[in-house]
Amino acid sequence: MAAVGSAVGLGNIWGFPNKMGASGGFTFLIIYLILAVLCGFIVMVGELAIGRKTGHGAVGAYKALSKKFKWMGWLGILSAFFILFFYCALGGYCIKYTVLNIGDLFGAGFGSNGLSGGEIFGNFLGSPAEGVIYGLIFVALTMLIVMGGIGGGIEKVCSVGMPALFVALLICIIRACTLEGTDVAVQILQADGSLVEGVVNGSALDGLKYMFSPGWAANVGYYVPAKAVVDGAEVSSIMVNGVAQAIVAYKSGAPSIFNVVSTAGGQMFFSLSLGMGAMITYGSYLHKKENLQKNALLIIIMDTMVALMAGLCVMPARFALDPAGNIGGPKLLFITMQNVFHSMGTLGPIFGILFYLLVVFAAISSSISLLEVIVAHFVDKARIEGKGDKRKPYTLIAAACVCLGCILVCADCLGSSGIAPANILNIAEPKNWAADWLDFWDALSEGVMMPLGALLMSLMIGWEIGPEFVKEEAEQSGHAMGSYGFFKVCVKFITPLCMILILYGQIKEFFF
């Protein structure tokens, strides 16, 4: 259950639904599932086998196989650090919004005080100190759980939290899909440059179409995939808060198949926590009786289910009640969804608390696995050197290091404070990696280090130590590795090839 918690995170809540809708809908889902089988399953079984065989975390596991692979473990630890820098910042944001909705429920002064989602988020970003405080609270929660160890803290939290997450998502899905659409008055920008009053029609069904329509979704490169109508005629763009935004029909703008494969692959590795040592670390705690194939398949299925359920919760609500709102990245959670809860009247704060609490849990279930990757290495090392149980001090030291990166991300305020990499390096037209510190750490980890780590691991198993190594370890459970023939072909040929394409696409997207 801890491994499932590692896989389920923020990438499921906003990343998967938004990328699925923007990159082909049902077509994206099919490509994602194919990659999950050809790459995700193969890499996960390999990482779990390495961890269980050696009984060590990422660095110790690779070192036990061969000293020349030790650096690959450090690559995983660096990835974990970089992800934690922005993950804890976003987790802190979610805590802030949980508190805010509690304030709305009881009419307290720390509620929204009648402000819109955009105004609330703008004020929050305008207060770096508040962001830092909530980010550090999230780091502290993660640290306390990891101090309890895999059995005393991590597994207990995930065993209770994961079922609760599914129930909370189900409640939100039922509510979201039964919402009546709201027609939003907007200013329509005509071809001649004049502005007229018009309407964007809200519909929960549009959210489902956005995610599941086969073929390419229309809103590639745009934030508004709805249709606006003036006097019975469709128009091309609208003004939202004084900014012109294009409106296009579904299926009108097609991304290349390569971009879809790359996007799906990057999402898969980030969502499944592959290529950063988390599954190696959790594998080291698995009993020999555990069926590695079954565990890997269960993790992939449950992770994908949560991602789809999150989409069924978020997208219908967003399209029904805020059809003219932005839908990308953090704004989906902290502007659009907050506007959705505002529009629900007295029930809004209740659903807001429920929603943001489940997002906090999804975030913390992943953050504890990331911190465990780091801590496990030093705990293993201390045990081997006869220094006893050093989990608590090493967890404290690792968390302190995470705090430094988290403070930088929070103080940057998503690039609005003037300390983003683009500002420091004086880049006039920054690429994705330089826009803010969140994107910088994301580009290094998700864009490069995670797919690179998975590629190197598959090459190591396929061509250096041999796939028989995984077969022998998998069959320690007493179950035959029925997928061995498939695993062998994939780990030697198909998975590395897919990984090279995904890595190239990720580097191209983030840096060029």
Locate the predicted segments by residue.
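Membrane-water interface regions at transmembrane-helix termini and the short interhelical loops
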Residues: 19-23, 49, 53, 64-65, ...
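Juxtamembrane transmembrane-helix boundary signature
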Residues: 1-4, 31-66, 88, 317, ...
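Loop-to-transmembrane helix boundary motifs in multi-pass membrane proteins
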Residues: 129-133, 302-308, 352, 361-364, ...
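Transmembrane helix-boundary motif of multi-pass solute transporters/channels
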Residues: 1-33, 277-278, 294-297, 301-302
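Membrane-embedded translocation segments of transport machinery
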Residues: 159-368, 382-394
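Inter-helical loop and helix-membrane interface segments of multi-pass membrane transporters/permeases
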Residues: 19-23, 56-71, 75, 89-151, ...
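Select transmembrane alpha-helical segments in multipass membrane proteins
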Residues: 1-3, 28-31, 68-81, 135-136, ...
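C-terminal membrane-solvent junction of multi-pass transporters and transport-like membrane proteins
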Residues: 75, 375, 381-401, 440-499
